[in-house]
A protein has these predicted regions:
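Stable alpha-helical elements in mature extracytoplasmic
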Residues: 27-30, 34-35, 71-76, 112-113, ...
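Inter-heme linker and motif-flanking segments adjacent to c-type heme-binding CXXCH motifs
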Residues: 24, 48-49, 86-90, 121-133, ...
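Gly/Gly-Pro-rich "capping" loops immediately C-terminal to redox-active cysteine motifs
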Residues: 32, 48-77, 104, 154-181
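Axial heme c-ligation environment in periplasmic c-type cytochrome domains
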Residues: 55-63, 81-113, 130-132, 187-218
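Electrostatic cytochrome c docking/interface patches
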Residues: 16-34, 118-140
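Positively charged n-region of N-terminal signal peptides that target proteins for export
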Residues: 1-5
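Bacterial N-terminal signal peptides
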Residues: 6-15
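The canonical Cys-X-X-Cys-His
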Residues: 31-46, 116, 120, 137-152, ...
Length: 220
């Protein structure tokens, strides 16, 4: 009887699509949305300072992927929000601030600032480009992956208790960074090991690329 019930249970769980209230995307995912909406125009897709508005206004490029690494979250909040920005002097003012940098204190909440900084950290630390749309990736993750990998990607989904599997912790950047985008796409499409299913024929190539992009953000 167990041999019959378990496959039915697995298929049923994979078919469940959690509602929006169950979603709990991590900070970098939320920060990316803010960055795309408010920052990318000047700072560019990858944070290199080469956005179209910056070029049109002839603003000197600021490469965020290098400048954020040595700065604290508190410092970056001051730069972005404008609160206490006047106390920034010397090299930091020359390298990070310009008269064209808006003050976002009336736009971003504290939690939004935290999320935005998390995404800036991702841009500064990642070795891999986002190859698809993470928003699509989130939906596919909730639909197909969350049941094993867990709500936040920590490998603690309900299936781990039911059949004793131990999925990869997708929030571990050391683990995910060693895998290229090509590696992750292959693992998802073709499966890996005893318990990682092959999703070829179920997920499209674009779905998988979006999923990989969301996975990249889970670890930041």
């Amino acid at each position: 009887m167990k041999l019959i019930v378990l496959p039915v249970l697995v298929l049923t769980l994979f078919a469940v699509t959690p509602n929006a209230e169950s979603a709990n995307p991590l900070s970098a995912y939320e920060g990316r949305g803010l960055y795309v909406s408010y920052c990318q125009l000047c700072h560019g897709i990858r944070g290199k300072g080469d956005g179209p508005l910056a070029k049109a206004m002839e603003i000197s490029e600021v490469n965020l992927t290098t400048t954020v690494r040595a700065r604290s979250d508190t410092f970056l909040k001051r730069v972005i929000s404008g609160k206490g920005r006047q106390t920034i002097t010397g090299r930091d003012r020359h390298n990070l601030l310009s008269d064209s940098m808006p003050e976002w204190k009336d736009i971003f909440s504290e939690s939004q600032l935290k999320s935005l900084i998390a995404y800036l950290r991702f841009l500064g630390n990642t070795k891999h480009d986002l190859m698809g749309d993470p928003e699509v990736g989130l939906r596919r993750y909730q639909q197909y992956c969350q049941v094993c990998h867990g709500l936040d990607g920590e490998g603690d989904g309900i299936m781990t208790k039911l059949i004793g599997i131990i999925p990869i912790d997708l929030t571990n950047s050391n683990e995910t960074n060693r895998l290229s985008n090509v590696d992750l796409v292959k693992n998802i499409l073709d499966g890996k090991g005893k318990y990682m299913p092959a999703w070829r024929g179920i997920l499209s190539q674009s779905d998988v690329e979006a999923l990989v992009s969301y996975i990249r953000l889970l670890s930041h």
